[in-house]
Amino acid sequence: MASILLPKRFRGETAPAEKTTPSWASKRLTPIAQFISRLACSHPIHTVVLVAVLASTSYVGLLQESFFSTDLPTVGKADWSSLVEGSRVLRAGPETAWNWKAIEQDSIQHAGADADHLALLTLVFPDTHSAESSSTAPRSSHVPVPQNLSITPLPSTKNSFTAYSQDSILAYSLPYAEGPEFLAATQEIPSEDAVETETQHGREKKTWIMKAAKVNTQNSVVQWANNAWTEFLDLLKNAETLDIVIMFLGYIAMHLTFVSLFLSMRKLGSKFWLGICTLFSSVFAFLFGLIVTTKLGVPISVILLSEGLPFLVVTIGFEKNIVLTRAVMSHAIEHRRQIQNSKSGKGSPERSMQNVIQYAVQSAIKEKGFEIMRDYAIEIVILALGAASGVQGGLQHFCFLAAWTLFFDFILLFTFYTAILSIKLEINRIKRHVDMRMALEDDGVSRRVAENVAKSDGDWTRVKGDSSLFGRKSSSVPTFKVLMILGFIFVNIVNICSIPFRNPRSLSTIRTWASSLGGVVAPLSVDPFKVASNGLDAILAAAKSNNRPTLVTVLTPIKYELEYPSIHYALGSAINGNNAEYTDAFHHHFQGYGVGGRMVGGILKSLEDPVLSKWIVIALALSVALNGYLFNVARWGIKDPNVPEHNIDRNELARAQQFNDTGSATLPLGEYVPPTPMRTEPSTPAITDDEAEGLQMTKARSDKLPNRPNEELEKLLAEKRVKEMSDEELVSLSMRGKIPGYALEKTLGDFTRAVKIRRSIIARNRATSDLTHSLERSKLPFEKYNWERVFGACCENVIGYMPLPVGVAGPLVIDGQSYFIPMATTEGVLVASASRGCKAINAGGGAVTVLTADGMTRGPCVAFETLERAGAAKLWLDSEAGSDIMKKAFNSTSRFARLQSMKTALAGTNLYIRFKTTTGDAMGMNMISKGVEHALSVMSNEAGFDDMQIVSVSGNYCTDKKAAALNWIDGRGKGVVAEAIIPGDVVRSVLKSDVDALVELNISKNLIGSAMAGSVGGFNAHAANIVAAIFLATGQDPAQVVESANCITIMKNLRGALQISVSMPSLEVGTLGGGTILEPQSAMLDLLGVRGSHPTNPGDNSRRLARIIGASVLAGELSLCSALAAGHLVRAHMQHNRSAAPSRSTTPAPMTPVSFAMTNGPERSASTTSMSAAAIQRSKR
């Protein structure tokens, strides 16, 4: 119970629990967070710009009112009171056993009534011990001291950091009352080795001058860095060793937290920007918290921030941003799956129509919002208790600031950061679209078709009319631009108008840590024993000898620098003086115009700030980067869609198998699942007897009006008014050669009508009309088909489409995930046989696949005049230099094609080069051809082979669409090996055979039989059957079944179980381009979860499809070999496809039911009296 009060990052990972009912607070707070985030997600750019402007305004306010106020003194304080602020007071006497004891400043008067009060001053002369230094520190005797002061030189004190700073130190003690006079006298100390030189202010010498007396001018970067380093060393000198170690570890932990943030965001799909935006959100929250804290009068110092911020970052971290990001990205993936399911009728259309950004963010906040808010509340309460604790030393102030920072971080998480996530999701959507379109174009698909296919992916299909951005119509972009500009002007006008009325003293008093860094409140007190331990020992010895209690005020070390007085005190030169006078006059001129003049003066003063000017440059750079980021999105993703969401449920798998089992076509009682609602499609024919009418060409209506004259028709054609013509007029023009048959789609713009016209033209063509006259009214369907994807991509001179029955085999467990295997075939028993093999494989734990190769090939042929030149070209291509040049040339043609290797062969003066490349998720023949052409061009023009003649881009050395030993040996496309281990009892019960019989059959048939036939790659039972069926169903190239079906099936008896494997070295598949862009084939790829390009690793989808095909071939091989071993093959085919098998009896035996043909042969109820003895014996096996 107590662990609930801890933030999530401290509770550790817990086992996922079942969903619980939301609490009362969750029900009321979560909708508020959802409403706020909904506004931010609806207008993400507006939200980001508004927050950035407010943060900039807060920064400018801090500058104007605190750090760069014009009313602050321009000369550093070199007076006694400023020096005493960081001092420490010590007392030694008989009551302290003559040991130094620290006392508070407010008790000095009481403690020093009976004691000598001394001041201990240390003068620091930097870099005077360095070997490279040309200056030397003044000796103690050369320090100008008034004669009326009682000054006692003391031994200086060295510490561990003195060696790094190379400083010289002089220490003095004197009565405390004489301190101000001594300080005034030592503001300048002459340098003993200084030489008088001529400067723009006359002749002068360099002098040791107190740095505190220097005028605050704009320093260079080198000066700023030098001052910062000096102040850093001062802090180290005054800090305890343990404190230094703790701070060092704190800063290391803080930077490790930053690294952890970027690594976590990288896992979520963002290499850089989400991590940077998370840091920006935290910085903006810190600025808001800082300005509120200072407005409320709470003093905050830079030293306090430098000590506390690392531990705040480590303690709070960025876990909430990471949790929200993970939830949003996961729900975005879930939404895309719902869209795909809704297309196939599996999902809810209402949910799929919801904007993906709104859905993802709202669902994530509903799931994680209350948990995040609770963590914020707990952390803020803890910090509030720290602020109210009364603990001194800066803890109160820092806790107050941290609480406000967390409050604003909470606000920005649900506004600014959710807007950033909306932009990220929109960019992911654009990226998927662009990647798919470019991959299709690389594969040879026209840009128009590629654009249409890419838009069909994901939530692009839901956009009607205008294109959308962030779920809003693009027509709102001009309105957004106007509102953004007006809002920006309004905010800046408010900021400008408030400048004259701001009170520079409204914040706490400010002290500087370094001359260019702003701080608040008093500096850190010195450590007296690190600064002057030797001097304190000398004073203590003198006090003990005099038996006189002593009070010592150890003051902050006084730093000097060797400089010309004119530069130190910023005396203007002739040129600089003019510029200064001009600047003063310029500002004074504006001051004379009252409030308006003070506005302009305030603006100019703000722009002079180096930090603000750099921020403006950074903001502009980020704006440019964001625009580039929107239009040049990189490869990102969240998680692999091929990874199963849950482990295999054996009960669910058994029910699925029983539904698709040949032995039972119904679900068990009590397992009926009502159909999910399906989206109503327009013009969907009813499932009635007239359903086939939609697949037939309706009888052409006779035109009421006769055809217009040919001259009028030709005039309409010239005026591009073809759409106004009737079908008969178009047929007439086409048959007279006025409209080419191949150009009907382009001319008409109506693809279905163009197909209809072409059918009429072919049917009436006199040369073939005796054969083709029936085409016009044939049963070849052509309507209700998306011809836009076909035109320019898949087929020409289209007259219709050929429906093929598609069945599913399975489910089949492949590498731990279940699949239903789509198979388009007209061969009966094939799907049922594969399903039986799937059932047996599942009983053995599923199939395991290994991808052995991935590389499509293209083998051009080039020729040379002489064998010598051909041999030189071969040697060059085989060399490392030649390979590098060809790879660079080839890879430059595509974002996805990457040349792996080249294999060369010489035949006379002909040189054959086999390019082997990866092609992403496309099968890639067109992609490779383009790369090969360019690589050969570079070889000819830039590599010194200008006498090379390109005979053919494809020289049959690929080898494509032909049986070849090269593909069998060297591989082509994907190389896959699939394996399954089937227990012996499963072989007997499901496959109706035994292990030894199957092993013997495989050796005799698949190995010896194929070898006797001289087969190349055909050491299998019927791999081509499965490959061809899946190829047709998923839009692969059917001609490549020739080499894709290369397969060797191996069976072994493994301790009583059947070990079966198939090795397929040349499986040529793709999930992008070609026939995969057609909607039915895309739907089957969706069924397998591999449609299109993989979101994170191009090529993973096509590799997954190859694994699925390999495992499916394994199932087909197992089932067919079992049927052959059991003698069921002919009987099953006869019962599925033809009449019953003939018998010797005059009365035929009853037909075995289809559902029993493959699985329940031994339990047939028909009489066996009419069967032969051999048949009866086989049936008992």
From Swiss-Prot:
Residue ranges of domain SSD in the record: 243-423
Enzyme class at the top of the EC tree: oxidoreductase
InterPro entries assigned: HMG-CoA_N_dom, HMG_CoA_Rdtase, HMG_CoA_Rdtase_cat_sf, HMG_CoA_Rdtase_CS, HMG_CoA_Rdtase_eu_arc, HMG_CoA_Rdtase_N, HMG_CoA_Rdtase_NAD(P)-bd_sf, HMG_CoA_Rdtase_sub-bd_dom_sf
Protein EC: 1.1.1.34
The keyword Endoplasmic reticulum appears for this protein: yes
Pathway of action: Metabolic intermediate biosynthesis; (R)-mevalonate biosynthesis; (R)-mevalonate from acetyl-CoA: step 3/3
Region Disordered: start-end pairs: 664-687, 1136-1181
An annotated Gene Ontology molecular function: hydroxymethylglutaryl-CoA reductase (NADPH) activity
Induction (UniProt): Expression is regulated by the Zn(2)-C6 fungal-type transcription factor FgSR which binds directly to the promoter.
Residues passing through the membrane, by range: 244-264, 272-292, 298-318, 376-396, 400-420, 480-500
Main location per the UniProt record: endoplasmic reticulum
Gene3D superfamilies: 3-hydroxy-3-methylglutaryl-coenzyme A Reductase, Chain A, domain 2 (3.90.770.10), HMGR, N-terminal domain (1.10.3270.10), Hydroxymethylglutaryl-CoA reductase, class I/II, NAD/NADP-binding domain (3.30.70.420)
Alphabetical UniProt keywords: Endoplasmic reticulum, Lipid biosynthesis, Lipid metabolism, Membrane, NADP, Oxidoreductase, Steroid biosynthesis, Steroid metabolism, Sterol biosynthesis, Sterol metabolism, Transmembrane, Transmembrane helix
Domain of life: Eukaryota
Protein's membrane topology: Multi-pass membrane protein
Catalysed reaction equations from the record: (R)-mevalonate + 2 NADP(+) + CoA = (3S)-3-hydroxy-3-methylglutaryl-CoA + 2 NADPH + 2 H(+)
Pfam families: HMG-CoA_red, HPIH, Sterol-sensing
GO cellular component: endoplasmic reticulum membrane; peroxisomal membrane
Localization in the cell: Endoplasmic reticulum membrane
Compositionally biased spans, kind Polar residues: 1137-1149
Biased composition regions of type Low complexity, renumbered to the chain: 1165-1175
UniProt record similarity statement: Belongs to the HMG-CoA reductase family.
Protein purpose: 3-hydroxy-3-methylglutaryl-coenzyme A reductase; part of the first module of ergosterol biosynthesis pathway that includes the early steps of the pathway, conserved across all eukaryotes, and which results in the formation of mevalonate from acetyl-coenzyme A (acetyl-CoA). HMG1 catalyzes the reduction of hydroxymethylglutaryl-CoA (HMG-CoA) to mevalonate. The first module starts with the action of the cytosolic acetyl-CoA acetyltransferase ERG10B that catalyzes the formation of acetoacetyl-CoA.
Protein name in UniProt: 3-hydroxy-3-methylglutaryl-coenzyme A reductase 1
Organism (species): Gibberella zeae (strain ATCC MYA-4620 / CBS 123657 / FGSC 9075 / NRRL 31084 / PH-1)
